[in-house]
Amino acid sequence: MTTWTQPDPSYTAAGQALARAARPDYFVWLEHVKAAAGCTRPIRLSGLLSTVDATTGRLLNDRHTDGLPDAAIFKACGNRRATVCPSCAQTYQRDAYQLLRAGLVGGKGVPTTVATHPAVFVTLTAPSFGTVHNRIVRKHSCADRRRCDCRAEPCHPRRDTGTCRHEQPAACWARHETGDPLLGQPLCLDCYDHTHQAVFNLFAPELWHRTKQAAERSLRKLCRRRGIPFHPAMSATGKVTYKAPVRLSPGKVAEMQRRGAVHFHAIARLDGVNPDDPADLITPPARIGIDDLIVAFAQAATDIAFTSPAHPDRREGWHIGWGEQVDIRPITMTGNDEVTDAMVAGYLAKYATKSTEATGHTSSRITADTVDDFADPAGDHIARLIDACWHLGRATHIPTPLTGRPVPYPDPGDRLTPFGTPWTCQDCGTRTRYAACPVCVAERQASLDTKPANTSKPHPYTRLRRWAHMLGFGGHFLTKARRYSTTFGALRAARIAYRRHEHNAPTHAYPQAPTSAEHLEPDTTLLIGTLTFAGVGWHTHGDALLANTAAALARARQQAGHEEIAHELGSTITGTQPVAA
């Protein structure tokens, strides 16, 4: 008869948490990891922390991270994907909201006058690559679209319920619910063009770039037709060029549909151009308005299309263009119309933490060792998309091995010496018996050594293997014009400065904790860290449990505070405004 032995408490997360909390330096450790407390996999840094006089450069103090709790400095990973780190993803999402909204109403270094500039909300979708199951609601009666329970229309009704060439049903009469796993799946996997969709995802950023350029060209031509003067500008070579009086400042985000095709939501703001200060954001001319901006983008979305480069599987390339569903709406700053600044910023920031979760596929970068786990030419929809990316991204040119190359042999009677009749080089005057002048060859080779040996551009389809885990899309989630708004780096720097200045007096100070330069007198000392990567993650599951719990409680208090402030503001506004009879 076997007896059960209770495991050591240190082997469980709860036991490790209790052991950590029982230490006398528990609150010191909790304060030390506060900056990365909510992170799932924080980065640990170790090394030397030196305090240096800023004026003389004299070393004042040296401290090693071995004297800190856990002998390391913890830094949040900063990953934007919610499936990887929910805490860092929430921070990224809030930064994205502030960045996008600042480009519409000002703030964060952007003048508030941009609120008077014309702006539109543009949605550009991918074309059809085959019939998929979808959910269409003609008229919503729900209060919240995120919890929509409205009755949907039949998926794909047809008068003649036939089959496709692969003997699959060509109609679907089901009324799909919101969480139906069939949504986004093709009616026939063999009829669906997975290859074309993978190529579209790859070239979608280039298509957006050309669409934006076409809209800008359309606005410039409109300015010429209406007689709006262009601004002369002097180039670096002394040539006078004329700049358009208007400029587009867009910001776009990418969203992955359930079928695995990427489409874009964009904010496009129209700015004027100050010839004396190109970085200045001024109001555009009055003769160019919101209607002209809508027409320019609508025309560009219709006209712009191109053919992808040739591929061995398709010499003529693939057609890259937008789908039929193009939506362009004006944005208002009053908060009373259909599309407002807060709605747009919140809608776009919602996708800040998304990747390919909508398709049901989440994975890290796929390699040759792991591709068989995800790609299958006869598998489901996502497996076929990944297989198409991997197949198209293969090496299309394999050089002949050295052992298989022909070796030229001299004919009988040929001289086997490199020397010939003496001759004089006409370029440098060198007298030589070599077939080529050694002086000129050395100079020419020296100039060639500064250039890459292979000047040919890599095949664009090779990027499909790198981004196979993203179903071919290799662009960033959020891109913007330089003058649209602030940057993520500026928002992070402001947050770090706030934490250091406002929270520089912890309740339980560690006696050997380093003090950064912002905590001292200005312009007196600097804190220089010579740090190296020590690892990723918490030391124990108990540490992760304690740190994440403390961070979750702090976020809950913060959220409750935000809701209370919003409630008080709403009550104040309601109390001051007259109620309609």
Language-model features, listed with the residues they occupy:
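Long, low-complexity, charged/polar intrinsically disordered accessory regions
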Residues: 1-84, 90-93, 318, 322-581
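Active-site-flanking beta-strand signature of metal-NTP-handling nucleotidyl enzymes
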Residues: 120-125, 187, 350
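A short, contiguous, amphipathic alpha-helix enriched in charged residues
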Residues: 202-245
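Long, contiguous juxta-domain segments that are non-catalytic but functionally important
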Residues: 71-117, 127-169
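Catalytic micro-motifs at enzyme active sites that drive phosphoryl/nucleotidyl and oxygen chemistry
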Residues: 70-74, 107-112, 224, 228, ...
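Histidine-centered divalent-metal-coordination microenvironment in nucleic-acid enzymes
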Residues: 85, 122, 239-276, 348
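Low-complexity, serine/threonine/proline-enriched polar segments
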Residues: 143-193, 304-315
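Helical (often loop-to-helix) elements that flank the catalytic cores of nucleotide-handling enzymes
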Residues: 266-313
